[in-house]
Amino acid sequence: MTSETPKQYGRVMLKISGEALMGDQGFGLNPPTVARIANEVDSVAKMGVEVCMVIGGGNIFRGLQGSAQGMERTTADYMGMLATVMNALAMQSALEALGHHCRVISAIRMDEVCEPYIRRRAIRHLEKKRIVIFAAGTGNPYFTTDTAATLRASEMNCEAIFKGTKVDGVYDKDPVKHADAKRYGDVSYDEVLQKHLGVMDASAIALARDNKLPIIVFSLDAPGGFRSILAGSGTYTRVHV
């Protein structure tokens, strides 16, 4: 079953986890997987949709885990931010191999490898149909990449956040563990928060709600899934007011 067809989006934010880049590995980057995701993004960009991205860093380093093991939380979070830059550069390389112009923009200055975050410049890149990858989170510890994606999507005037996951939407319970799990077609921000449905962290959901920014949750593993939703089909859950 599919949800109601959403309107055509002109500018979107794609949020994926760092783990999505691992493939079947237990750590790091799997080049064929990175290339496959790049192809998905490229196919959407070729529709004329302006695409920006945020990629997590959990395939390389996760700040919360480092903190739990005795590392100072602030230091651990900064290490996690650096991991997102590595993932962003890998995705940039894969997209450029497909012939698409792409810019990595970091919230932490490292001018030798990527651009600093300047809002107007980032918007101009999107207007020129370049794919923009935002790296290093918000540039501040204690904020997740989900929150960073929602923040940047709001600043870029995106029409929706597309959250690519391992499942094809939001379920009332873990569909991997429970065969009777039911997928939501549409769900409100408040219900996601009240029922702890795990779409994004609470700060990200609250920010999306305050800015009336819909979140489309879909399976990143489904070939052509990202493009099919933008074309008016596909299976997903829409989080909205």
UniProtKB/Swiss-Prot annotation:
GO annotation terms (biological process): 'de novo' CTP biosynthetic process; UDP biosynthetic process
Which reaction does this enzyme catalyse, per its entry? UMP + ATP = UDP + ADP
Regulation of its function? Allosterically activated by GTP. Inhibited by UTP.
Q: Which Pfam families match?
A: AA_kinase (PF00696)
Q: Which residues bind UMP?
A: 57, 77, 138-145
Where is the protein localized? Cytoplasm
CDD domains in the record: AAK_UMPK-PyrH-Ec (cd04254)
Name the InterPro entries for this protein: AceGlu_kinase-like_sf, Asp/Glu/Uridylate_kinase, Uridylate_kinase, Uridylate_kinase_bac
Q: What does this protein do?
A: Catalyzes the reversible phosphorylation of UMP to UDP.
Q: How does it assemble?
A: Homohexamer.
Full protein name: Uridylate kinase
> Which species does the entry assign this protein to?
Paracoccus zeaxanthinifaciens
Q: What is the lineage of its organism?
A: Bacteria, Pseudomonadati, Pseudomonadota, Alphaproteobacteria, Rhodobacterales
Gene this protein is translated from: pyrH
